[in-house]
């Protein structure tokens, strides 16, 4: 009798995706992050579901319902902190996953890459709305500041902001709709992730060399299932260390104060994973310009396939672009640091220089270095 996993209509799909999938024999641990992101999403959906059972999306009770979860619900504190710090793990994996894609030229799989960029936007939107739900000071003011940015859109801006708010300020209507969106979006993300995988399996995985690996494939199971399990264990070790020993390390103390529209916190800043984009937003003195730069800082990823000038796909054998890549990584760390600093000298000028370098490296220097490397290797006639 033929193996059921190869004949059953449903098991057959799973088999071709996770068991008998032909994978390159040389993919490194940088290829673990796709599966880690899947696990992160599952953890977030499960913990989120249990939190939603006890949470109330009303301005009067939201803050105290989160307190109730932490104090009175069995292991509520664990679920809450796993969800909050799970978001941080999600973004760490996301940034490493995108960074891997940039380094090894995975963006040449256009469909997979574009769905990935869409996923990044969806996850960022979900995380932003989730941060509003506990209705602390930073929740309220973060929501006010970020939604207010839409008022920079000419002509329709103000109307659009009031439409999103459901009134003339961030209030009960805003919180209720943010909860609804925060609940539904992860399921949309899960659906998009399946499409992401679908497109990936049309072409097969990339590998560190960027060369065609059809001549040397191995089955996904057991080789990469075991490798992924190791990655998952390491990730859970990091997550649970964070949750059980340093649950508030990545949070903001201001969010332990209930939202008060009459009192502005001294420094309004988002969660750490948005700080690089926030720094770019703040470094431009013009409101609309800042908003455009903010959106472009992520949307620039969609341009990567068109900015690829080299005859080689990966950066493995391209030392000049490698140097630029690591400068870009350092630059993003500087932007993340600046995003959390007050708007005063010398942070303003550092932020502006880092923002200029961010766009310059991606749009100008990397394409030029690709051409230079090809010339040096005499890949052009």
Curated annotation (Swiss-Prot):
Record-annotated membrane-spanning stretches: 33-53, 77-98, 113-133, 178-198, 226-246, 288-308, 320-340, 347-367
GO terms of molecular function: metal ion binding; ubiquinol-cytochrome-c reductase activity
GO cellular component terms, A-Z: mitochondrial inner membrane; respiratory chain complex III
Key words, A-Z: Electron transport, Heme, Iron, Membrane, Metal-binding, Mitochondrion, Mitochondrion inner membrane, Respiratory chain, Transmembrane, Transmembrane helix, Transport, Ubiquinone
Localisation per UniProt entry: Mitochondrion inner membrane
Binding site for a ubiquinone: 201
Principal subcellular localization: mitochondrion
Any single Pfam family the record assigns to this protein: Cytochrom_B_C
Membrane topology: Multi-pass membrane protein
Any coiled-coil regions, as ranges: none
Residues reported in the UniProt entry to bind heme b b562: 83, 182
Its biological purpose: Component of the ubiquinol-cytochrome c reductase complex (complex III or cytochrome b-c1 complex) that is part of the mitochondrial respiratory chain. The b-c1 complex mediates electron transfer from ubiquinol to cytochrome c. Contributes to the generation of a proton gradient across the mitochondrial membrane that is then used for ATP synthesis.
Miscellaneous field: Heme 1 (or BL or b562) is low-potential and absorbs at about 562 nm, and heme 2 (or BH or b566) is high-potential and absorbs at about 566 nm.
Subunit structure: The cytochrome bc1 complex contains 11 subunits: 3 respiratory subunits (MT-CYB, CYC1 and UQCRFS1), 2 core proteins (UQCRC1 and UQCRC2) and 6 low-molecular weight proteins (UQCRH/QCR6, UQCRB/QCR7, UQCRQ/QCR8, UQCR10/QCR9, UQCR11/QCR10 and a cleavage product of UQCRFS1). This cytochrome bc1 complex then forms a dimer.
Protein name: Cytochrome b
Originating species: Mus macedonicus
Underlying gene: Mt-Cyb
């Amino acid at each position: 009798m033929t193996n059921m996993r190869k004949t059953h209509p449903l098991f057959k799909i799973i088999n071709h995706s996770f068991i008998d999938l032909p994978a390159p024999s040389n993919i490194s641990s940088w290829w673990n992050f796709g599966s880690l992101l899947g696990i992160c999403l599952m953890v977030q959906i499960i913990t989120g579901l249990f939190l939603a059972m006890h949470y109330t999306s009303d301005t009067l009770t939201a803050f105290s319902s989160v307190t109730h979860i932490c104090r009175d619900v069995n292991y509520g504190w664990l679920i809450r902190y796993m969800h909050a710090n799970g978001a941080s793990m999600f973004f760490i994996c996301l940034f490493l996953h995108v960074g891997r894609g940039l380094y090894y030229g995975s963006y040449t799989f256009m469909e997979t890459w574009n769905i990935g960029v869409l996923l990044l936007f969806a996850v960022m939107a979900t995380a932003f709305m989730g941060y509003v739900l506990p209705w602390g000071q930073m929740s309220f003011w973060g929501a006010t500041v970020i939604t207010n940015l839409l008022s920079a859109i000419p002509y329709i801006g103000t109307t659009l902001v009031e439409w999103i708010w459901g009134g003339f300020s961030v209030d009960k209507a805003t919180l209720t709709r943010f909860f609804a969106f925060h609940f539904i979006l992860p399921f949309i993300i899960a659906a998009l992730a399946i499409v992401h995988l679908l497109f990936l399996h049309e072409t097969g995985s990339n590998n560190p060399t960027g060369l065609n690996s059809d001549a040397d494939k191995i089955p996904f199971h057991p080789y990469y299932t075991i490798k992924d399990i190791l990655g998952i264990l390491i990730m859970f070790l990091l997550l649970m260390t964070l949750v059980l020993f340093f649950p508030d390390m990545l949070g903001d103390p201001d969010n332990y104060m209930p939202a008060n529209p009459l009192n502005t916190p001294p420094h309004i800043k988002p969660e750490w994973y948005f700080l690089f984009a926030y720094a770019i937003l703040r470094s431009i003195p013009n409101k609309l310009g800042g908003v455009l730069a903010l959106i472009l800082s992520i949307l620039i990823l969609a341009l990567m396939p068109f900015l690829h000038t080299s005859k080689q796909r990966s950066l493995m054998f391209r030392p000049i672009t490698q140097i630029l890549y690591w400068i870009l990584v350092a630059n993003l760390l500087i932007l993340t640091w600046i995003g959390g600093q007050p708007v005063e000298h010398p942070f303003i000028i550092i932020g502006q220089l880092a923002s200029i370098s961010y766009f310059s490296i991606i749009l100008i220097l990397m394409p030029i270095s690709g051409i230079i490397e090809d010339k040096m290797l005499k890949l052009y006639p």
